[in-house]
Regions:
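Alpha-helical promoter-recognition and RNA polymerase-docking modules of transcription initiation factors
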Residues: 2-124
């Protein structure tokens, strides 16, 4: 399980926890942290270090969603799997940029269609 601590840097001002390795966060913890990071992301000004940290951490924490969605296209061949994951990451980034916490929808439910849609667009 990844280590989550209170940030001792400038990020502490934003109230964001420091996540040592976002890609190693357990899915149950990722759900709670994702909600916290989206809450802070909506309050932060785009272009600041805190905003970039929150956005990048969200991307890294939710990379497993991309691998999960890309698994549906495994039959396309192992050589294409890396390309599929890269295209899926674009979908994840679009989902993060468009997600609104006020809609009270789980982020995973919101992101999977974006990820799969981007992958399908890759094959057209």
């Amino acid at each position: 399980m990844a280590t989550v601590t209170a940030a001792k840097t400038d990020l502490d001002v934003a109230g964001l926890p420091e996540v040592a390795d976002p890609s190693q966060v357990a899915p149950k913890d990722a759900r709670q942290l994702t909600r916290l990071f989206f809450d802070q992301l909506s309050r932060l000004e785009e272009g600041t270090a805190e905003y970039s940290y929150a956005r990048n951490t969200l991307i890294e924490m939710n990379m497993s969603l991309v691998r999960f969605a890309a698994g549906r296209f495994r039959s396309r061949g192992p050589e294409e799997m890396e390309d599929i994951v890269q295209v899926g990451m674009i979908g994840l980034i679009k989902a993060i940029d468009r997600f609104e916490l006020t809609r009270e929808v789980e982020f995973t439910s919101f992101a999977i269609p974006y990820i799969v849609g981007e992958i399908k667009r890759f094959f057209r």
